Amino acid sequence: MRVLENVQPQKVFYYFEELAWIPHGSYHTKAISDYCMNFAKERELEAYQDAYNNVVIIKEATAGYESAEPIILQGHLDMVCEKENDTEIDFENEGLRLFIDGDFVKAKGTTLGGDDGIAIAYALAILDSDEIAHPRLECVFTVDEEVGMLGAEKIDLSMLKGHQVLNIDSDVEGTFLTSCAGGVTAECSFPLVFDEAEGLQYRLTLTGLMGGHSGGEIDKERANAIVEIGRILKHLDDTLEMGKIGRASCR
């Protein structure tokens, strides 16, 4: 029995649940990419899949909209895979366990994958409909967005005719953004020399912070565990020898 069969828009959440059953964390998008390609093949839609698992699906305009400007619908196939400490799940081989909590759709003990599964679900629902009038639709599904826009960097979009892009990757209903938070990833290498440590050893762990997303909460001045650990270390005795600094799995 489907969990979301009575959630509206029904067709959108039908596809969202379909996608939730397919493991699709970053770097593991082959299965969900193949699902989208099979979807297109069953409906005889023009579709492309590259070696990186990016997918483009094209549906020609309905009657009366042949001369209208094509619309590009864009979302990403990968999700952030995080779980609660007491949850057992193999994200590479198991789908999500959805449930309804009041007005919210949630996943048991894990992230939901709404970012950006809902975008793919919207696009598939529109592509599947015979009742929605539309210009030529060009649906672009990229991979590994959560780890650095890797799919977007590699994708070939030479088959597209549209110039108007709707990127479906925001979290506020009814709000349209014409901006981007941006992001920078720095990889640094330093020459290190390891010696046997003497004296007492201590583990310092900082947890329980509110957290947040730099795209939406960067101005809230919330504590960042990495920054705060750095401040603590800066004020400790200079004779302290550091062994290792680590952080959680999410950036």
Question: Where do the protein language model's features map onto the residues?
Answer:
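Structural signal for hydrophobic packing residues in well-ordered secondary-structure cores
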Residues: 20, 40, 44, 81, ...
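Acidic/His- and Gly-rich active-site-bordering loop/insert found
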Residues: 2-103
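Short alpha-helical patches at coil-to-helix transitions and adjacent helical residues
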Residues: 33, 116-120, 226
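Conserved beta-strand termini and adjacent loop/short-helix elements that scaffold enzyme active sites
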Residues: 50-52, 142, 245
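Active-site metal-coordination/substrate-binding segment of hydrolases
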Residues: 65-147, 152-154, 159-163, 201
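Midchain, well-structured core segments that form catalytic/ion-binding scaffolds
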Residues: 23, 95-97, 101-106, 110, ...
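Buried hydrophobic packing segments
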Residues: 36, 40, 120-127, 155, ...
